[in-house]
């Protein structure tokens, strides 16, 4: 059984017990439980994608860690003018562990 969930403008395929990195959830502390909105639930041969049914289904996950991703370097350069700009960025992530995927009511 797995589900497709939406978090931070991205979609993730998750199953119970998976640890997934999502964009930082600033309101959640380590150990808190968060709910993720569901776009699709697959349970064996049963596929649920109806938005009216999925509106009541929320995937439960536990916050495991907050951390930063790898640093990326942004360089801008224009030849013959001496124009150079350097910038770095580290995206902040939240690691969550999926604890429950409820099934659709039949």
UniProtKB/Swiss-Prot annotation:
InterPro entries: bL21-like (IPR028909), bL21-like_sf (IPR036164), Ribosomal_bL21 (IPR001787), Ribosomal_bL21_CS (IPR018258). One of its GO terms (cellular component) is cytoplasm. Pfam families: Ribosomal_L21p (PF00829). Keywords: Ribonucleoprotein, Ribosomal protein, RNA-binding, rRNA-binding. GO terms for biological process: translation. One of its GO terms (molecular function) is rRNA binding. Part of the 50S ribosomal subunit. Contacts protein L20. Belongs to the bacterial ribosomal protein bL21 family. This protein binds to 23S rRNA in the presence of protein L20. This is Large ribosomal subunit protein bL21. The gene is rplU.
């Amino acid at each position: 059984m797995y589900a497709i969930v939406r978090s931070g403008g991205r979609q993730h395929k998750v199953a119970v017990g998976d640890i997934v990195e999502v964009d930082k959830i600033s309101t959640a502390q380590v150990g808190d439980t968060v709910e993720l909105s569901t776009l699709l639930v697959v349970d064996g041969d049963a596929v649920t994608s109806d938005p009216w049914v999925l509106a009541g289904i929320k995937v439960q996950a536990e916050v495991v860690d907050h951390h930063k991703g790898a640093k990326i370097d942004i360089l801008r350069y224009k030849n013959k003018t001496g124009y150079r700009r350097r910038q770095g960025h580290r995206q902040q992530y939240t690691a969550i562990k999926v604890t429950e995927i409820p099934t659709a009511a039949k």
